[in-house]
């Protein structure tokens, strides 16, 4: 059977459509013979074209997941231009995922999850306690990636371990402001009058699989004052070998000496060093210059009647004598009497009447006065 061919007149209309058909063919061909076209679309990912417009054979294009999506581990994220101007096949490789799980101070992710970066909804991760912490059996150490791409709330399933009780310091104090759990710090001090030897603080640190204090307890040693100062002409009562804080030393003076200052001084502390509260007293003897000076005799005035040549005239002479007067002027004569005397001369004796009073004590007369008295008394003629 012979197929009828169209006649020339019938084929003419097709020639008029030839330019349009050629244009469609050219648009479908690659820009350069042997090039691949634009890379294929991948859900939730974008190709990294880096400004290229042609993709010759063996060209590799890598995709990057869009925001909030993460590459699925093990899935391809690139295509290659093959012979025949065709791209290699690629599957969807981006999916929604939680971010890296929350970092906890008390716990860390177990080994399988440390390097993982893809955590789709429903993923469960597990933690283990860090050194210095212990598991709380009643609480779960797991977290879950929720539908909102957030991790479930982490509870405190790991608790700090406790250091041993630090004990006590003799004559000192231990300050424990924050307890004795892992990471705690305690400080030491001594009572007044004692000096600290050792560390002033200690820390609760990791020691193997447990925790221990970093430093042992210090020692508080008593502070002593230097030997008390000795004093001249005195002694220390009940002297001892050592004098600690607030202990006192008492002084006493030898016989015949007087104490000047405080009888006692006591031991004090200044900048962890012992020192005495003050200087010791002094013992001073009785000075000769402190004796009462002797009383100097005052001049004594005595009225002594004198004898005149003329019996008709009478004259009384008053003389004043001084104990230390020179002999060239008068010779003092001392007489002591314990009674009061009154002498009256006889009438008609030719002498002037008078009265001589001698008081107890020392009475001094001049020689002339003494002779006159003796004549009056009839002892001399």
Swiss-Prot record:
Self-association and partners: Monomer (major form) and non-disulfide-linked, covalent homodimer (minor form). Interacts with ADGRE5.
Glycosylation site list: 95
UniProt gene name: CD55
Biological function: This protein recognizes C4b and C3b fragments that condense with cell-surface hydroxyl or amino groups when nascent C4b and C3b are locally generated during C4 and c3 activation. Interaction of daf with cell-associated C4b and C3b polypeptides interferes with their ability to catalyze the conversion of C2 and factor B to enzymatically active C2a and Bb and thereby prevents the formation of C4b2a and C3bBb, the amplification convertases of the complement cascade.
Composition-biased stretches (Low complexity): 310-328
Protein name: Complement decay-accelerating factor
Keyword Membrane: yes
Result after altering residue 267 to S: In CHAPLE; increased complement activation
